[in-house]
Amino acid sequence: MDADCIAGTCRGLKQTSGLKLVVVDGIPSIVDHVDDEPRVLEQFSKLARDLDVAVVLTDLATRGPLRKPGLGNLINGKAECRYADAILFVYRPEFKCACGGDANKAELMVLKHPWIQPYTLNSVSSPNTRDSRITDLLRPDAQFW
């Protein structure tokens, strides 16, 4: 399925079912070449504005295993920063090294957002339940404007 097909389907669903959310898991799965990604991002940005829906796109990041990801690790970072209202990374520290770590912990890193400075949320999920909780809502150094 390509971006044009998804956009057309979304327009139909907005009219018939009141579509509110569009999620595409993996931008590379809908673009033929990495050079096409900025056009696709612009297309989904326009779709979000035209239909007044939230659009969530996931993409790959490149980084060394010993560092936390950043905006510079996005394959098409300039285009993603241009068209995205918010950019978040899910970082799982146990993948840093072979020494292990807690597989139930993850950090949600907000690297671009229209209202707040970058910050990190720590999340812990229980292996016995499907519940997860944010262990610290905001770091003390997070600032709102």
Predicted regions and their residues:
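C-terminal regions of RecA-like/P-loop NTPase motor modules
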Residues: 3-26, 46-51, 64-145
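Conserved H-loop
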Residues: 53, 57-60
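Conserved ATPase-coupling elements of RecA-like P-loop NTPase cores
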Residues: 30-37
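C-terminal extracellular loops and terminal segments
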Residues: 38-42
